[in-house]
């Protein structure tokens, strides 16, 4: 059983015009795919999906999707938002199959930021989420990045993070040791440089 539940209806009216009509009717188009079943087009009430995803944890948890009363466990794969207003315009969900690995983007939580700042550093967050591969039962709510021991000039990479048990960082598995955050010296404004001379 999951804490996150979303209701949907099967959708047969497809295409750009149909999607636009849905949005005008305060609903959004969505699709669920994966597992042994065919992809299925859905309609979801816009307020209901917006409320669910106000909780950051919903992005990285198994969601119980009720499609016309039939329940299935899914995770969000992708979400399209309006570029200016930020509301959800479309969602893709992937079915969760027990024993099979899935990929999902998990939010990053940075802790211990005060220590490098007290040493005169500025912190740049390079990523806000990390793509992971794991079974649904091992899907973490977030990945924690501890910056308490970071010195000025330090770059934190994926390889510096400890993945939770059963979880693999997708980029790292493909040889891409991405930067996650860096601690750098404060940039001096051009006016300040001129005043110093």
From Swiss-Prot:
Pfam families: Ribosomal_L25p, Ribosomal_TL5_C. GO terms for biological process: translation. One of its GO terms (cellular component) is cytosolic large ribosomal subunit. The keyword Metal-binding does not apply. The keyword Transmembrane does not apply. GO terms for molecular function: 5S rRNA binding; structural constituent of ribosome. Keywords: Ribonucleoprotein, Ribosomal protein, RNA-binding, rRNA-binding. Part of the 50S ribosomal subunit; part of the 5S rRNA/L5/L18/L25 subcomplex. Contacts the 5S rRNA. Binds to the 5S rRNA independently of L5 and L18. Belongs to the bacterial ribosomal protein bL25 family. CTC subfamily. This is Large ribosomal subunit protein bL25.
